[in-house]
């Protein structure tokens, strides 16, 4: 059984971007609200969607944000390479 993976991309006041992946039992808005609150509103959601075959696609209905496609995919790959 494959688990569907979602993501939200955040931007800070300096313009730096961060991508967070999470399982499908959470909504995009639940994850984003938690991150924004924990960061004292330092981070703001700018895109969201799903990860399919290593690519960022789709949209977040609960956040009313679309995937930025290749831009989010490159950020995801960069994040994974930093581990």
PLM feature segments, named:
Residues 1-83:
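Intrinsic low-complexity, intrinsically disordered or marginally ordered coil/linker segments
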């Amino acid at each position: 059984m494959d688990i569907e993976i979602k993501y939200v991309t955040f931007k800070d006041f300096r313009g730096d971007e961060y991508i967070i992946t999470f399982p499908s039992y959470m909504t995009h808005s639940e994850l984003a609200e938690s991150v924004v609150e924990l960061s004292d509103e330092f981070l703001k959601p700018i895109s969201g969607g799903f990860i399919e075959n290593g690519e960022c696609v789709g949209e977040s209905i609960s956040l009313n944000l679309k995937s930025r496609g290749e831009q989010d995919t490159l950020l995801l790959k960069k994040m994974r390479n930093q581990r």
